[in-house]
């Protein structure tokens, strides 16, 4: 008997078959470099930088940029940004540079070149007859890389948000040490013609490379990061949210996870903390793994760890945090149950407020305060643990312990208390809710409750 088969009848005929489904070719892939080779891309023939500058600038002015030419120019222009490595720099076993080495962004990666010439057309006309200066190259590189950031801004941002960002970026790249090379609003006009450039692998790779370089190397032109900073921890919103969460509640990751009372967290926690990743290594390739092409589908995204993501942002909503109210709910990951757990944890960690004296006039006053606090603690421990409880609350020794919180949820039948619902309604009703956001979910789910 084949354990994989099922047997049934169709029109009195016995059928035996093996049910098979499509294999997901797009599974989560952990970023790791196993062959000790730097991340790499292949571009066309290296250009003459003066000719390339004039061509790309004319394309920027005419809103007609050739992505292959732009990538070829950005890679060639890396030579202008030499800096000194402050410490030995290694990642995934690769020595990137030694302390004191002179390096440029292309020291971090391998850029292979073919013999294929670029177009280097002058689409927008060109008055510049002299050769460009280094500040002009730096300004052009900065503006081009900013197209990456602009293309990552979602359409959910209302009003003139994107235009305002583009204008501020232009101001940066017309102020020393940079120099004005385009007219006002050029960046936004050009962006509309290449709004999806964040999906071009080579462009994304170069943006990540520049960002990884400038995030570590002190440099005159470090402000170029304004356009590339979104490549850091890209598609890691689940892991980044968890990191922010444990900082807020002032617990270790291990302590925080003890409060995650739901079976669906198990797979996600295992996924987030896969051994062998350089999640905690400063300046690792891990930080830019998505842009450097080290993973096709991030195991750290909000979709990959949706229950964790939902819980964290429901706690954030309870606190009235705008970022959480604006975040997008992962609808397939038990948002109703996560909102219940989020209410209890929100109340435990933030709702009561923790006020205590932290600063003193002198050491004597500090010691007197600590002695008085110890006496108070001893008295509390000597108490039998019974408390005059409001709102049917349940206390057991340490009221914030995972056991105590879990017991309170069970005593309330796995439902929110009225005080939780009032809090959720008050924070979400005062907020202009974006489509599919946590604020909208809370409004729709709880605003009709008494």
UniProtKB/Swiss-Prot annotation:
Keywords, A to Z? Capsid protein, Helical capsid protein, Host cytoplasm, Phosphoprotein, Ribonucleoprotein, RNA-binding, Superantigen, Viral nucleoprotein, Virion
Instruction: Tell me which GO cellular component terms the UniProt record holds.
Output: helical viral capsid; host cell cytoplasm; ribonucleoprotein complex; viral nucleocapsid
Q: Name one Pfam family in it.
A: Rhabdo_ncap
In its UniProt record, a GO molecular function of this protein is: RNA binding
Give the main localization category.
virion
Cellular localisation: Virion; Host cytoplasm
InterPro entries reported in the protein's UniProt record: Rhabdo_ncapsid (IPR000448), Rhabdovirus_ncapsid_C (IPR023331), Rhabdovirus_ncapsid_N (IPR023330), Rhabdovirus_nucleoprotein-like (IPR035961)
Describe the PTM: Phosphorylated by host CK2. Unphosphorylated protein N seems to have a better affinity for leader viral promoter encapsidation. Phosphorylation of protein N in ribonucleocapsid may stabilize the interaction with protein P, thereby playing an important role in viral transcription/replication.
SUPFAM superfamilies tied to this protein: Rhabdovirus nucleoprotein-like (SSF140809)
Residues the record lists as Phosphoserine modifications: 389
Q: Function of this protein?
A: Encapsidates the genome in a ratio of one protein N per nine ribonucleotides, protecting it from nucleases. If expressed without protein P it binds non-specifically RNA and therefore can bind it's own mRNA. Interaction with protein P abolishes any non-specific RNA binding, and prevents phosphorylation. The soluble N-P complex encapsidates specifically the genomic RNA, with protein N protecting the genome like a pearl necklace. The encapsidated genomic RNA is termed the nucleocapsid (NC) and serves as template for viral transcription and replication.
Subunit record text: Homomultimerizes to form the nucleocapsid. Binds to viral genomic RNA. In nucleocapsid, binds protein P and thereby positions the polymerase on the template. Protein P acts as a chaperone on free protein N to prevent it from aggregation before encapsidating genomic RNA.
Q: State the family it belongs to.
A: Belongs to the lyssavirus nucleocapsid protein family.
Q: What else is known?
A: Displays a superantigen activity in human and mouse, activating mostly V-beta-8 subtypes of T-cell receptor.
Protein name per the record: Nucleoprotein
């Amino acid at each position: 008997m084949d354990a994989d088969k099922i047997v049934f009848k169709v029109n009195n005929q016995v059928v035996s078959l093996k049910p098979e489904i499509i294999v997901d070719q797009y599974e989560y892939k952990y970023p790791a470099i196993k062959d000790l080779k730097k991340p790499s891309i292949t571009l066309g023939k290296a250009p003459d930088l003066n000719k390339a500058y004039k061509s790309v600038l004319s394309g920027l002015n005419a809103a007609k940029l050739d992505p292959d030419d732009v990538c070829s120019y950005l890679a060639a222009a890396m030579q202008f940004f030499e800096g000194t490595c402050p410490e030995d720099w290694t990642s995934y076993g690769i020595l990137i540079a030694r302390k004191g080495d002179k390096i440029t962004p292309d020291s971090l990666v391998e850029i292979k070149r073919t013999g294929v010439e670029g177009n280097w057309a002058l689409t927008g006309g060109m008055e510049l007859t002299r050769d460009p200066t280094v500040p002009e190259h730096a300004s052009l590189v900065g503006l081009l890389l900013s197209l990456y950031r602009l293309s990552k801004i979602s359409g959910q941002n209302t009003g003139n948000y994107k235009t305002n960002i583009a204008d501020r970026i232009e101001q940066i790249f017309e102020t020393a040490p940079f120099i004005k090379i385009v007219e006002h609003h050029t960046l936004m006009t050009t962006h509309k013609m290449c709004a999806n450039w964040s999906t071009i692998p080579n462009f994304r790779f170069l943006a990540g490379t520049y960002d990884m370089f400038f995030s570590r190397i002190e440099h005159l032109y470090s402000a170029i990061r304004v356009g590339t900073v979104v490549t850091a921890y890209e598609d890691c919103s689940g892991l980044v949210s968890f990191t922010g969460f444990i900082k807020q509640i002032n617990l270790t990751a291990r302590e925080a996870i003890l409060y995650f009372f739901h079976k669906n967290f198990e797979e996600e926690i295992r996924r987030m903390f896969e051994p062998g990743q350089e999640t905690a290594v400063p300046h690792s390739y891990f930080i830019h793994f998505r842009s450097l092409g080290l993973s096709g589908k991030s195991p750290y995204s909000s979709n990959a760890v949706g229950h964790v993501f939902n819980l964290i942002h429901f706690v954030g909503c309870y606190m009235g945090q705008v970022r959480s109210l604006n975040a997008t709910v992962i609808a397939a990951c038990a948002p109703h149950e996560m909102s219940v757990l989020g209410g209890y944890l929100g109340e435990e960690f933030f709702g009561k407020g923790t006020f205590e004296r932290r600063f003193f006039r002198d050491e004597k006053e500090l010691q007197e305060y600590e002695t008085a606090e110890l006496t108070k603690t001893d008295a509390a421990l000597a108490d039998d643990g019974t408390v005059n409880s409001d709102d049917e609350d349940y206390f057991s020794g340490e009221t914030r312990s995972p056991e105590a919180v879990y017991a309170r949820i069970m005593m309330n039948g796995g439902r929110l208390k009225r005080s939780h619902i009032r809090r959720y309604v008050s924070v979400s009703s005062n907020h202009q809710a974006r489509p599919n956001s946590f604020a909208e979910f809370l409004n729709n789910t709880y605003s009709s409750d008494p």
